[in-house]
UniProtKB/Swiss-Prot annotation:
PROSITE patterns to which the protein is assigned, alphabetical: RIBOSOMAL_S15
PANTHER family: RIBOSOMAL PROTEIN S15, BACTERIAL AND ORGANELLAR (PTHR23321), SMALL RIBOSOMAL SUBUNIT PROTEIN US15M (PTHR23321:SF26)
Subunit structure: Part of the 30S ribosomal subunit. Forms a bridge to the 50S subunit in the 70S ribosome, contacting the 23S rRNA.
Protein name: Small ribosomal subunit protein uS15
InterPro entries: Ribosomal_uS15, Ribosomal_uS15_bac-type, uS15_NS1_RNA-bd_sf
Recorded superkingdom: Bacteria
GO molecular function terms attached to this record: rRNA binding; structural constituent of ribosome
Length: 89
């Protein structure tokens, strides 16, 4: 299940540079993090849903790539984003 339009708009407003900034790296990582967190709750109930688990692993990989890109380009923005999202790195 994907995020609602309202949830996406809230994330874009919080992490974007303006209300229509859906393409910046920070927004993309925040949207992927929200989807990943939503799917983790799904897997607590549906342990054998391997088809969706593959999608989850793909999202985690995409988020990792975006975070690596951001770390290469701007370490300060990377550190700020990690702290705001509460990721382990």
């Amino acid at each position: 299940m994907s995020l609602s339009v309202e949830a996406k708009a809230k994330i874009v407003a919080e992490f974007g540079r303006d209300a229509n900034d859906s393409g910046s790296t920070e927004v993309q990582v925040a949207l992927l993090t929200a989807q990943i967190n939503h799917l983790q709750g799904h897997f607590a109930e549906h342990k054998k849903d391997h088809h969706s688990r593959r999608g989850l692993l793909r999202m985690v990989s995409q988020r990792r790539k975006l975070l690596d890109y951001l770390k290469r380009k701007d370490v300060a923005r990377y550190s700020s984003l990690i702290e705001r999202l509460g990721l382990r790195r």
